[in-house]
């Protein structure tokens, strides 16, 4: 089985940042992307386990994969409309 995180077109390192900085950085990064492109987010703030999925739902992006069992957490999102 292939690693979905290795297929990301863009990457955002949010290690060491605390809420609300990771989501603010995700929003800024996604704005620069084309529809359908993917972003890998690497973070260690426990709040991202709640904030990243909520951000995706609210902004109509797809959360393609997540790894939140241990740090660093990883999220793969696809830009929506």
Swiss-Prot record:
Please provide the Gene Ontology terms (biological process) for this protein.
tRNA wobble position uridine thiolation
Q: Active-site positions, per UniProt? A: 19
Keyword tags: Cytoplasm
- Its main localization is cytoplasm
Q: Where is the signal peptide?
A: none
Where is this protein localized, as stated in its record?
A: Cytoplasm
**Any GO CC annotation of this UniProt entry:** cytoplasm
Example of a GO MF term: sulfur carrier activity
Q: Which InterPro entries match?
A: Sulphur_carrier_TusA (IPR022931), TusA-like (IPR001455), TusA-like_sf (IPR036868)
Please identify the protein, giving its name as recorded. Sulfur carrier protein TusA
Native organism: Shewanella sediminis (strain HAW-EB3)
Q: Which gene carries the instructions for this protein?
A: tusA
